[in-house]
Design a protein with these regions (language model features):
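Active-site phosphate/pyrophosphate- and oxyanion-stabilizing loops and adjacent acidic/basic residues
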Residues: 29-33, 109, 160
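A glycine-centered loop/beta-turn motif at secondary-structure junctions
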Residues: 180-241, 253
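Active-site-adjacent pocket-lining segments in enzyme domains
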Residues: 113-115, 136, 140, 147-158, ...
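Cysteine-nucleophile active-site neighborhood
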Residues: 73-139
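Short glycine-/acidic-enriched loop or helix-start segments at secondary-structure transitions
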Residues: 17-18, 56, 79-80, 112-114, ...
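Glycine-rich, phosphate-binding/catalytic loops in enzymes
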Residues: 23-25, 84-88, 119-120, 174, ...
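N-terminal beta1-alpha1 cap of cysteine-dependent amidohydrolase-like domains
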Residues: 1-89, 93-99, 220, 224-284
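Pocket-forming structural segment of enzyme catalytic cores
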Residues: 10, 117-209
Length: 284
């Protein structure tokens, strides 16, 4: 049976329009592209609760899905508002339905909040471009989410959120100098695996985000000036076209976890193989 996955696009319409103008697709479509790269047979639906109440396809409900995943977002949990509370409410419904649940970046704070944890702005500031020296904990090295992943790696990263308190019973799976980078926990009838970075991102996505954030990244001290920011984005666009460009890979300190798409996408692949596809087989 074909597995059915619900992709929850965390961005609002204005942000998605800017993404699409820069890359040709928005965060929801980009996530579907990553999922289908791993398994072309997947049936994927996209909902966008930042805009309005969720409308599933006719005759379909949460119980009809074998997995739910939340994309990244330029929103921040602690700012509140309807475009955020609708997503947290949807996460609670996913937990109640017992559907396998995954989140990239924004998806982790949403699920943590839904399950009773706490999210704040990171006192260390924004993490942008590539999360460095992400290190698996002992639990992470043993967890199916990270099967085949190096014990220390870098990953596409864009976030200001910080997990100040995990839900009861949660397990830390990976950390770096900026804080928690991955966790797993159960809540209500469901189980969540999540990462604070973007395994689904291409180099193009990071370049487009750098251009979208613009001078804010200079003000925050991520880049010396706008010329340095533009050079960074230009390098990543070149890597998108030439992913084996050794001088650029060296310049940005990118190891095998970024050079090899199989490793970059390992967390999503492992979630599909370990949880989603078995759920689809049981559902019949």
């Amino acid at each position: 049976m074909t597995a059915r996955v619900l992709v929850v696009d965390g961005n609002n319409a204005a942000i998605r329009a800017r993404q699409a103008a820069a890359t040709g697709y928005d965060s929801g479509v980009g996530y579907v592209n990553a999922l289908r790269r791993l398994d072309p047979s997947l049936h994927c639906d996209v909902v966008r609760p930042a805009d309005a109440a969720v409308q599933f396809p006719a005759g379909v409900g949460l119980a009809d899905y074998d997995g739910v995943t939340i994309t990244g977002s330029a929103l921040n949990i602690y700012n509140g508002g309807a475009e955020i509370t609708r997503q947290v409410d949807l996460a609670r419904a996913v937990f109640d339905a017992g559907v396998p649940f995954f989140g990239s970046c924004w998806g982790l704070p949403v699920a943590v909040t839904a399950a009773g944890g706490e999210v704040r702005a990171n006192p260390r500031g924004r993490e942008f471009g590539f999360g460095r020296r992400i290190t698996l904990t002992e639990a992470g090295r043993a967890h199916r989410l990270f099967a085949g992943k190096p014990a220390v790696f870098e990953a596409p990263t864009i976030h200001l959120d910080y997990i100040a308190r995990l839900p009861e019973g949660a397990v830390e799976l990976a950390t770096n100098d900026m804080g928690l980078q991955a966790a797993a926990f159960s809540h209500a009838r469901g189980t969540f695996w999540g990462v604070q970075y973007h395994p689904e991102y291409e180099y193009l996505d990071i370049a487009a985000a750098a251009e979208r954030y613009g001078v804010r990244l200079v003000t925050e001290g991520m880049f010396a000036d706008e010329a340095a920011l533009a050079a960074f984005a230009r390098d990543l666009r070149q890597l998108q076209a030439r992913p084996d460009d050794a001088p650029l890979l060296w310049r940005h300190g990118l190891g095998t976890a970024m050079r090899d798409p199989t490793l970059r996408l390992a967390e999503i692949r492992n979630w599909l193989d370990a949880v989603v596809l078995p759920h689809a087989r049981r559902r019949g």
